[in-house]
Amino acid sequence: FGQGAILCHPWVMKEMKAAQDPDRTAALESFDEALAGHVRYGISNAFRSFWFAITGSKFGSAPGDDYTRPFFRKLDRYAANLALMSDVSMLLLGGKLKFKESLSGRLGDVLSHLYMAGAVLKRHHDEGAPEADKPLLAWSMYNSFHQIETALSAALRNFPIRPVGWALWALVFPLGRRAEAPGDRLNHRVASLLMSPNEARDRLGNGVFLTPCENNPGGRIDSYLA
């Protein structure tokens, strides 16, 4: 995660390249521009993290329809949280970040669930936002949000520099953690969809080899639930 955080950062690579530029005049100009952008980026992420937390991610522009827009806003909040924590971790730990495997692993978990939740939302809209798929979409979102907050919470509670961890907690979770795992009622709705033939299950298995033959247990289970 540490190497990826540097390579994917919108400003760090520009700062590093400017520092290595043999032309001192051009280097100072480029570095000042990148540093100013980096500072603005950090302040923006800190403000967005706090604002989304205290407002419950209910405000701000977001794509999607009335059903999915709150999910997109939640992803925007967690993306700001990840960017803020990554920036602070790189600033204070530097090259030691890649040796802090628990911290980098938890931040990597946040990134993974952001990708997965974003992919689920994109597929939902690409397929025309079918009504029958909403329980599957909701379960995926609530599960990812819960996993993201669990990883963020663990990273903050165990941050190597404790006062910094407390300060970050005040920005990321000023009102405490709110995301809960999918409840039993939603679990039952999803289970019912998966255990009976329907269009939602057909879409979920689209492109998957489901022929019920000897060496394909997935196909055999699908035939049992037909």
Positions of PLM-derived features:
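Flavin-dependent oxidoreductase catalytic core characteristic
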Residues: 1-226
